[in-house]
Amino acid sequence: MEWTDDGIVLGLRRHGESSAVVELLTREHGRHLGLVRGAAGKRMRPVLQPGNTVRAIWRARLDEHLGMYAVDGLTLRAAELMSASHGAYGVTHLASLARLLPERDPHEDMYFRLEHALDDFADAGAAAAHIVRFELAILTELGFGLDLESCAATGETSDLIYVSPKSGGAVSRTAGAPWADRLLPLPPFLRESDEDHGWSDQDLLDGFRLTGLFLLRHVLEPRGQGHSDAREGFINAVTRARTRLTRA
């Protein structure tokens, strides 16, 4: 068995003195692990950092085997990612989200979403918006997508400003007014018609509150998990970074 694919490094664990089992989110083969010999060496160590994009050749005698990776770096962005205060938290959290996907199950859209997020990570606000959208996409990929395109009560497609915490459906301003205190805010940057809309600090926090609720309910708690410490660390780091920018 052999294939070649591009992949984003999610993490690795040491195997013996110089090798490592490397976890990639690949474009065509999904989340996939393989053994890399010499992973601890000077040449491979900087290549196999989380957040980097690599070209990987996977070989195994049988498809169900762990197999071996031969890896070359394509986009080595890890050092730049880690230079930002929110970088390490963000990369760690994105990796934990990607690990919710079934192993070896292709999710090409998620690969491109992750790559796009990592390429636009320098600005703390943009990074936060990307992660909220990535969390939303993870829910969709796992079968728990939110319907944010039309009002759950009336079918309207405009003036959608709420989300029902029960159904996960959008609610228009008029339909939601009597129950506004029971509904979740729908940040403008998550509405399909406002994808290029900017975001305030409150918009970002509302986005994390929205996706966080449904991730816990439908994905994490059924697995006996909670939100990662990296998620909270990322949100706090972004808040501090944007506060410093506002005061400057």
UniProtKB/Swiss-Prot annotation:
Any Pfam family the entry gives: RecO_N
Provide the alphabetized UniProt keywords: DNA damage, DNA recombination, DNA repair
TM spans (from-to): none
Q: Which InterPro entries match?
A: ARFGAP/RecO, DNA_rep/recomb_RecO_N, NA-bd_OB-fold, RecO, RecO_C
Q: Name one GO biological process term.
A: DNA recombination
Extract the Gene3D superfamilies matched here.
Nucleic acid-binding proteins (2.40.50.140), Recombination protein O, C-terminal domain (1.20.1440.120)
Organism's domain of life? Bacteria
**Gene Ontology CC: one annotated term:** bacterial nucleoid
Q: What does this protein do?
A: Involved in DNA repair and RecF pathway recombination.
Concerning its family, UniProt says:
Belongs to the RecO family.
Q: What is this protein called?
A: DNA repair protein RecO
Q: Which organism is it from?
A: Bradyrhizobium sp. (strain ORS 278)
Classification from the root reads:
Bacteria, Pseudomonadati, Pseudomonadota, Alphaproteobacteria, Hyphomicrobiales
